[in-house]
Amino acid sequence: MENITVLGAGSWGTALALVLADNGHRVRLWSHRAEQVREINEQRTNEKYLPGVRLPEVIIGYDDLGAALDGVSIVVLAVPTKAIREVLQRARMCLAAPITIVAVSKGIEPGTHKRVSEIVTEEISEWLEDVVVLSGPSHAEEVVLRHPTTVAVSSPNMEAAQCIQDVFMNHHYFRVYTNPDLVGVEVGGALKNIIALAAGISDGLGYGDNAKAALITRGLAEIARLGCALGANPLTFAGLAGVGDLIVTCTSVHSRNWRAGHMLGQGKKLDDVLESMGMVVEGVRTTKAAYELAKELGVKMPITEVLYEVLFDGKNPKEAVDSLMARGKKQEMNDLMNIFAEQ
């Protein structure tokens, strides 16, 4: 039994806290909102993020970051990517011994183009024992119902990945694989949110399953293209952190990114969509970061490019789809072979 801290009491952080509790661990669930912590400790609920879910007594809410981190060796990082640096900078001041960070947030930082594991290493290198990334098709709403879910973990230190595999593995409903391709696991988890936004727009426009299937398939090629340019193994994108996460995020009503895209396709403005969501839509920031990174590396990402124009340049969603359909002729097999030939 471990004492494990989860930083971030949103839907995913809370769901993983429940998995850890089911596995016999004592869990400290940290939030910067005191009223949310009181609800967790007094009502045993987190209604804003996971309505109707009762939390076991071994999950204790904390709003004091120092107290939440005191004496633990495993920390699950589940805050939105835009808050990661700030939280880690605060955490660094509270640590007294090295920790293993399990990064479960999915995104790429605009401007720096860094993945979450890189931000972690940059901010707390002196206190970092290991960094492990957990990713895969895993909506929190289904995890808390204990529906079968399968994810992958990766790390520069595969012994650390195997340790975290053991910590999270639940033989009833939460299966964990290891994957040595850290870059691929992170890139797949981050970029699938871009394609989910596009799939939501397509559904909002009423284009049906054919269009969405094409977006998912060609979107996977874009993800692999950028991932391989960053050093990923293309086979990762055929696995849980690639096509697995992509399918669930593009097709499920639980997907925030799909829902946001759906509203955009129906004609709503981005600011209004984000306000109505009330939760972070990681794909918006990731679209900006991936667009910048693709330009820097000379990687062609046409879906990402037109989505960027919709989100940040005000392009009409229907015109964006029309521009994708009007692109020049391509040979699909050559495109796929080029992705694999880079390895």
Curated annotation (Swiss-Prot):
PROSITE patterns, alphabetized: NAD_G3PDH
Pathway: Membrane lipid metabolism; glycerophospholipid metabolism
Pfam families for the chain: NAD_Gly3P_dh_C, NAD_Gly3P_dh_N
Enzyme Commission numbers on file: 1.1.1.94
Entry keyword set: Cytoplasm, Lipid biosynthesis, Lipid metabolism, NAD, NADP, Nucleotide-binding, Oxidoreductase, Phospholipid biosynthesis, Phospholipid metabolism
Molecular function GO terms recorded: glycerol-3-phosphate dehydrogenase [NAD(P)+] activity; NAD binding
Catalyzed reactions per annotation: sn-glycerol 3-phosphate + NAD(+) = dihydroxyacetone phosphate + NADH + H(+); sn-glycerol 3-phosphate + NADP(+) = dihydroxyacetone phosphate + NADPH + H(+)
UniProt subcellular location: Cytoplasm
Binding site for NADPH: 11-12, 32-33, 106, 140, 256, 280, 282
NCBIfam families the UniProt entry points to: PRK00094.1-2 (NF000940), PRK00094.1-3 (NF000941), PRK00094.1-4 (NF000942)
Functional summary from the UniProt entry: Catalyzes the reduction of the glycolytic intermediate dihydroxyacetone phosphate (DHAP) to sn-glycerol 3-phosphate (G3P), the key precursor for phospholipid synthesis.
Family from the record: Belongs to the NAD-dependent glycerol-3-phosphate dehydrogenase family.
Name recorded for this polypeptide: Glycerol-3-phosphate dehydrogenase [NAD(P)+]
Organism for this UniProt entry: Geobacillus thermodenitrificans (strain NG80-2)
